[in-house]
Every structure is written in C-alpha cells, then in structure tokens.
Amino acid sequence: QRQMCIRDSTNRIERNMKRVAAYLGIPEEKLHIDIRWTMLMVNVSDEKHSFSKFQKCEKHGINMEAISKISKLSWRAIEQDYSLDKYEEELEKIARQERNYTPYVVAICTGFACGGFCKLFGGDWIAFLITAICTFVGFRTRARCIEFGINVYMSIAISAFLCTCLAYAFSFSGLSSTPYHPLLACTLYIVPGVPLINFVDDMIDNHLLVGITRAANTVMMVGGMAFGIAFALRLLVMSDVTIDQKFSELSMVPHDAYWVYAVAAAIAAMGFATIFNVQRRLLWVVAVGGIIAVCTRNFVNFELGYGPVIGSFMGSFVVSLIAVKAVHWFHVPNHVLTIPSVIPMVPGVLMYRSLLALINMRGVVGEVTLAFSNGINSALIIFCIALGVAVPNIFARRYIAKDRQRFLTQMLAERRARGKFIEW
C-alpha cells in the first residue's frame, strides 16, 4: 500500500510483496494479489483457510528514496532475521521519514529546472531567471491550494494560470531578448512524467487496469494544466496575430553549443530530482543522465537527421540502458536514475503550438491540421520517451529475475537452516 501511494510501478510492488511473503514463509502459489490504483487486495489461502486483506490508498505522491528503501528492507528482513514487529517498525520509519528537501528548496530547484527547459528551447539566461521566478510562484501556489483542500486538478489549473500570467507580464519588461520563451517553460513542472512512464511499464507488463488508470490520471493532470494556460491566454488577449506568429517562429533547431545544452539539461534533471525526492548523493548521477539524454537526442535528431521522435526515443533508451548496469553501482531501482534524467526532453514548444492553434481557431482551412500535427508529434515524443525508459528495464528484468530468484531461494534456505523460517 505504501508503494502504491508513492507511485511505484505495479511490477515492483508485486515483486516486493512476493518477497515479503517469502520472508513470512508464505508459499507463492498460496498468495493472490490484485493491485488497483486506489485499492490493494491480498488473499492467502490453502485447502482449509482463507485470509483476505483490503488496503485503500487515497493520496499519491512521488518519493524515490522511499521506493529504494522499501525494496532494500524486504531483502534485509530475510538476511537479518527480522521479527514481524521489527519489520513493521522499520516500515513505519520509512513512512514517517522527512523528505530530503524542504518545500521551499524544492520550489527553488523546480524553478531552475523549468529555467533549464527555457534554455533548452533557445531562451537566453535572463529568460532562464524569469522562468525560474514564475515557476517558483506557481509551484508554491499549487502546494498551498492542495494544503487548503482544493481539488488536485483544479490546483494544477490555478498554478498554470498564475505562471502564464506572470510570464506574460515579464514579456513587457524588455529585460530578455527572448521574452516569450518563459511562457513555454514555466508550467512544465506539471507534466506528469512518472505516471506516464509507469503507465507504459504497466501496459507492457499486462497490468492493464492500473495502466489505464495511470493514463487517465495523466490526461486529467495535462487537462488541468491546459485549462489554466488556455484561460490565461484568453483573459490576457494573447490570441492576437503577433503573439501567435512569435510562437510559430520559435526555432526547433539548436543555436547554442552542446555544452550549453548539457548545462541546461543537468540543471533541469537535478531540479526534477528534488521534486521526486531523489537522494542527494545521486543528484550528480541524474545530472549526467540528463546530459546524455539531451545530447543523444540532439545528435540523432539534427546530426543524423532522424527527427525529434526517434531522437527522443534514443535519448531515453541510451539512459535506460546505462541505468540497467548503474543500478548495481548505486544500489537503487532503475526509475530513480532514469525518470529525472529524461524529463528535460519534454517537447514544450510543440505542446504550446498545438494548444495555441486550438485556441486561435477561426474556421480557416488547415487550422485543425496544424493543431493536430503539433499535438500528435508532441504526444509521440512523450510516448517514445516513456517507451525508451521502459523497454531496456523490462528486458533486463527477464535476465535478472532468474539470478534474483536463485539468490532469494539461497537466502531462505540459510534462514531455514538457522531455524528462523516460518513454515506455512
């Protein structure tokens, strides 16, 4: 239940539950698990007895450190012969543990992360700072709205609206030579990267119900963001020809050196890592992952000419492939390293072009085609990013699973020899 609340993948939840069942001496064939988005159902039964437990999960929040610690705890409990009380005590410690970063530190880092997006989209360093300010205000606004009990999706819409209004106001300041780029980047902290990647992971692993629910949750979050942005654009009368042309004229081709994009990608990746509560010791690893992802994407896209969709897939694929080995170096789950690293590849320019095209429709021939072309391209890029992360991890699990099962069997045999094993 704790893993579902911190948005772990369904496959990992199932593996950990089976490992804990083995620690308790429950044979796998007598354990029946059904995982849903808001409900976890477990049944243990034999020919004479049947025990069922339903556990509800209402609040969902990303916590990468907790994901890592829960996984390690299930192994440690077997190795060190934990009593049930000791295991429960350790689990409660993980649940009560303070996050690595205070709310205001996370808000500041999120601001810099979206500033990194702005730089990746071609903005200057003043636009970077403007984006960081707008994002900081929007991020804290969303947090306050949720604290006051406002609906999550409405909180997202309010924060997106406020971010867009602030970025629009800054466009008149004359401080930046790229005044419209902050509008593209200031709300991208809302894009639900973790649910999206877990959705692809679940669908490939045949956890269809949870996968579809995650997809619906992702659509609702993006819908809330789009509503807030669209309302701001209408309220601020930003449907005029000049603004529309400015967004359509924004170049998708990099104009800066690769090292500039590497710095921006590292900042964005580390910023999102603080949102996901990644351990401090891993921030530099995530930064390197972000650099590899963005530079690979740009090389495949522009140097080899395969386009942004294939480029984004290859960027996330390479990072995920490296992470398959790196998880053994840093002793953390794959997603702790991969998800923050690939977030800087989110296609903000295409998303905005699609949204603006839909808002500014006046019945002219070709408007629908333009809107859907940008929308489909941005959706394909996001899907390929998620697919690139999921595929190497899924195939690696097939090979690692046998070794892991062999190791688990050996540990259980040693525990039985010590007289600590509970026979069912």
Task: Describe each model-derived feature in a short phrase.
Residues 182-186, 198-202, 206-223, 256-258, ...:
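C-terminal transmembrane helix-loop-helix hairpin of multi-pass membrane proteins
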Residues 10-35:
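Divalent-cation
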Residues 118-134, 179-192, 247-264, 305-317, ...:
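Structural signature of hydrophobic alpha-helical transmembrane segments
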Residues 85-98, 112-123, 139-150, 239-253, ...:
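Short juxtamembrane and helix-loop transition motifs at transmembrane-helix boundaries
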Residues 173-179, 237-253, 358-373:
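Membrane-interface helix termini and inter-helical loops of multi-pass transporters
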Residues 116-117, 121, 137-145, 162, ...:
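Alpha-helical membrane-inserting segments
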Residues 99-198, 275-276, 280-285:
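Core alpha-helical transmembrane segments of integral membrane proteins
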Residues 2-5:
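Short, small-residue-biased leader/transition segments that mark boundaries at the very start
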